[in-house]
Amino acid sequence: MGCRQSRHSRGKRAEKVEETQTELLEALDKEGRILEGRHEEAGQVPQTSNAQEKVSLSDCIQEAKASLQNTCASHVSPQEATQAKMNKVDGSILSRLYRNHIQDYGSPGPFWEQELESLHHVIEMKNERIHELEKQLFLLEMLKEKNLILALKNTTLRQEVEDLQFQAGNRLTMSRQLRKDLLQDLEKESQNGHCCSRRRSH
């Protein structure tokens, strides 16, 4: 209540200053017009002197107006500065009250509802991305298992090939040995046959 009354009284003082300024300006204009009319009605002063007095009177009126406006501005500016400070204080108080209201009642305004919707949309997009990454990870795990199975099969096949090569080498060695033995046996038989034929001839 005290803040409202002080703001109300300050507003009244500012309005009163503006009204006083307007009244003084109107009075100066009225006085200038009256003086000019008197000079024109008198008709006793030469034309040039009357024109000079009009110019001088107009300059005085303009100076008085400028001085009055500066004086009123000096009174209004502190009022505006004070009002700006009060608005700033009111804004901080309203912000704090709004935060407390949200904490107590959980009833956000349209702006925060839009922000929550945007946040919810972002969360949904992140969840979709996570699901996609999980699918990719699952496929990678399956490919990894398949690669392990293929690697085991490849190792088994290599072992079998090595065994077959070893067996083939052994058979080749055996066949060579058999051939060698056969040749030796044939040579022995042929030598024995020559010896027998010589004995018969003697």
From Swiss-Prot:
Residues 1-20, 32-52 are annotated as: Disordered. It comes from the Eukaryota. A lipid is attached at residue 2 (N-myristoyl glycine). It is found in: Cytoplasm, Cytoskeleton, Spindle; Midbody. The keyword Phosphoprotein applies. Residues 112-146 form a coiled coil. The modification Phosphoserine is found at residue 92. InterPro entries: MTUS1/CCDC69. PANTHER family: COILED-COIL DOMAIN-CONTAINING PROTEIN 69, TOUCAN, ISOFORM A. This is Coiled-coil domain-containing protein 69.
